[in-house]
């Protein structure tokens, strides 16, 4: 689109001289004026261009157009267009950065938008019949959305239902942005963080969409319940894994303890015979115990009794075998073998 622009004045004096007839014309106009009731809302993208459209009323011929913008609660003139000679309009541009231009319809074009360009703008038109018409605009500058990410956490409940926590995050955004989750059919779930439950036995795969949007752009990311719950459905729940792990650890500890006890018992040997056979202490004194010979001397009672005639070699020998434990045997002999002690009991019969 072609842009018509007048040469810039060479000095401040020439600029004042050039503006004087314009001010005179504006001052001598009639008191009749009209303006748009509500400002026209315009949206621009950061770093791109925005156009504030200007449309003259039907049957009206513009003589002077002045574009103003508000800065620190005051009106600042940005562009002045003199249309006294429509074939060669004169334009004064006060923008030193040359970001302001005029289209063929005398609309205001702002290039390389910044956040500072946000604000109120007015177009003041003076017609040939000295009528003043004012158009108002509100320009908002937005940044295009980017880096939309989703996070999820799934949990398999005891009844077989998959519980899904969904979060939608828009990074590096300083402006207010609408972020929400939607179910099938564009049904809003009411926010960037939602919790849903999905039972694979009673329902098929479902899709949920996270949508983020502002005045100039929108983004969306979709997820499916089947893909989110695939991991927990194929793996046992955490509580079952914990239970199985605990049982395994306890079993291993018990097995190690039993093996250690057996090893210690084998190293110490079998239990002492005295503890295994407590009756042995009683049986060792018995005269009939095999393995030892005990000699006992028997004294005749004091009562008179008839004594038989002694016979040559009339002595009697009583053998008694006494058993000793292995430990007693080793202590007595130094050898780990049983010994047999024989004691002759002599019974003398004296007349």
From Swiss-Prot:
Limits of the Ig-like V-type domain: 36-130
Transmembrane segments: 240-262
Residues glycosylated per entry: 82, 101, 112, 152, 159, 172, 186, 193, 218
Distribution of this protein across tissues and organs: Expressed on hematopoietic cells. Isoform 3 is expressed in thymocytes and B lymphocytes of C57Bl/6 strain.
Localization in the cell: Cell membrane
Phenotype for residue 349 to F: Strong inhibitory signaling in germinal center formation (absence of SH2D1A/SAP)
Superkingdom, taxonomy of origin: Eukaryota
Ig-like C2-type domain segment(s): 147-210
Primary location: membrane
Motif (ITSM 2): 317-322
InterPro entries documented for this protein: CD2/SLAM_rcpt, Ig-like_dom, Ig-like_dom_sf, Ig-like_fold, Ig_V-set
Outcome (variant: residue 295 to F): Strong inhibitory signaling in germinal center formation (absence of SH2D1A/SAP)
Outcome following mutation: residue 335 to F: Strong inhibitory signaling in germinal center formation (absence of SH2D1A/SAP)
Modified positions (Phosphotyrosine) in chain numbering: 319
Post-translational modification: Phosphorylated.
Region (Disordered): 272-295
Topological domain spans for side Extracellular: 31-239
Domain notes: The ITSMs (immunoreceptor tyrosine-based switch motifs) with the consensus sequence T-X-Y-X-X-[VI] present in SLAM family receptors have overlapping specificity for activating and inhibitory SH2 domain-containing binding partners. Especially they mediate the interaction with the SH2 domain of SH2D1A and SH2D1B. A 'two-out-of-three-pronged' mechanism is proposed involving threonine (position -2), phosphorylated tyrosine (position 0) and valine/isoleucine (position +3).
Role description: Self-ligand receptor of the signaling lymphocytic activation molecule (SLAM) family. SLAM receptors triggered by homo- or heterotypic cell-cell interactions are modulating the activation and differentiation of a wide variety of immune cells and thus are involved in the regulation and interconnection of both innate and adaptive immune response. Activities are controlled by presence or absence of small cytoplasmic adapter proteins, SH2D1A/SAP and/or SH2D1B/EAT-2. Triggers cytolytic activity only in natural killer cells (NK) expressing high surface densities of natural cytotoxicity receptors.
Name of the protein in question: SLAM family member 6
Organism of origin: Mus musculus (Mouse)
Lineage: Eukaryota, Metazoa, Chordata, Craniata, Vertebrata
Gene from which the chain derives: Slamf6
């Amino acid at each position: 689109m072609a842009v018509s622009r007048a040469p810039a004045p060479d000095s401040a004096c020439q600029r004042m001289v050039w503006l004087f007839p314009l001010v005179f014309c504006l001052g001598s106009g009639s008191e009749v004026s009209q303006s748009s009731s509500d400002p026209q809302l315009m949206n621009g993208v950061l770093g791109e261009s925005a156009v504030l459209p200007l449309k003259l009323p039907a049957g009206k011929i513009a003589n002077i157009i002045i574009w103003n913008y508000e800065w620190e609660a005051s009106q600042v003139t940005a562009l002045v267009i003199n249309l006294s000679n429509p074939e060669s309009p004169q334009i004064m541009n006060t923008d030193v950065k040359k970001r302001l231009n005029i289209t063929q319809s005398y609309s205001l074009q702002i290039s390389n938008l910044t956040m500072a360009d946000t604000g109120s703008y007015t177009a003041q038109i003076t017609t040939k019949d000295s009528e003043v018409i004012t158009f108002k605009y509100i320009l908002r500058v937005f940044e295009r959305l980017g880096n939309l990410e989703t996070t999820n956490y799934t949990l398999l409940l005891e009844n077989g239902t998959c519980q899904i926590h969904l979060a939608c995050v828009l990074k590096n955004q300083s402006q207010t942005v609408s972020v929400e989750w939607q179910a099938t059919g564009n049904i809003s779930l009411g926010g960037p963080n939602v919790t849903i439950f999905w039972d694979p036995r009673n329902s098929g795969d479902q899709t949920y969409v996270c949508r983020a949007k502002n005045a100039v752009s929108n983004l969306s990311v979709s997820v499916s319940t089947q893909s989110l719950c695939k991991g927990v459905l194929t793996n046992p729940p955490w509580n079952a894994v914990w239970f199985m792990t605990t049982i395994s650890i306890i079993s291993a500890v018990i097995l190690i303890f039993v093996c250690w006890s057996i090893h210690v018992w084998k190293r110490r040997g079998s239990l002492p015979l005295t503890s295994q056979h407590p009756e042995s202490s009683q049986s060792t004194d018995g005269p009939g115990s095999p393995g030892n010979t005990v000699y006992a001397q028997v004294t005749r009672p004091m009562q008179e009794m008839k004594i038989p005639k002694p016979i040559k070699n009339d002595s009697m020998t009583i053998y008694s075998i006494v058993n000793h434990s292995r430990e007693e045997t080793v202590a007595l002999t130094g050898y780990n073998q049983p010994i047999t002690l024989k004691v002759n009991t002599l019974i003398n019969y004296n007349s």
